[in-house]
């Protein structure tokens, strides 16, 4: 009893607003915008939708960067920041905290973790 939207399985019993939040890159406010722009789906569930309404939702979501597209964009942006050789990128490369935390007594977890630089 699942529906496939953009490669994500969502239960048909779920409310549309909350079901769309299962998709990476769509939060509660974005799902409200999607529901209000297409039609007023706020109180509907996925099992009540027709095929045309499902297609409208999918077409609207395909215009937004979600799932794998969004993940690749985030990775590319992180790689660009690493190449800038700023203070923050140097701290990332050395596997140290980069937001001003002290490292004399703390940051043991950050130092010993096996981090992959993307």
From Swiss-Prot:
GO terms for biological process: translation. Belongs to the universal ribosomal protein uS13 family. This is Small ribosomal subunit protein uS13. PANTHER family: 30S RIBOSOMAL PROTEIN S13/40S RIBOSOMAL PROTEIN S18, SMALL RIBOSOMAL SUBUNIT PROTEIN US13M. Part of the 30S ribosomal subunit. Forms a loose heterodimer with protein S19. Forms two bridges to the 50S subunit in the 70S ribosome. Located at the top of the head of the 30S subunit, it contacts several helices of the 16S rRNA. In the 70S ribosome it contacts the 23S rRNA (bridge B1a) and protein L5 of the 50S subunit (bridge B1b), connecting the 2 subunits; these bridges are implicated in subunit movement. Contacts the tRNAs in the A and P-sites. One of its GO terms (cellular component) is cytosol. InterPro entries: Rbsml_uS13_C (IPR027437), Ribosomal_uS13 (IPR001892), Ribosomal_uS13-like_H2TH (IPR010979), Ribosomal_uS13_CS (IPR018269). One of its GO terms (molecular function) is tRNA binding. Keywords: Ribonucleoprotein, Ribosomal protein, RNA-binding, rRNA-binding, tRNA-binding. The gene is rpsM. It holds the Pfam family Ribosomal_S13. The keyword RNA-binding applies. It comes from the Bacteria. It comes from Carsonella ruddii (strain PV).
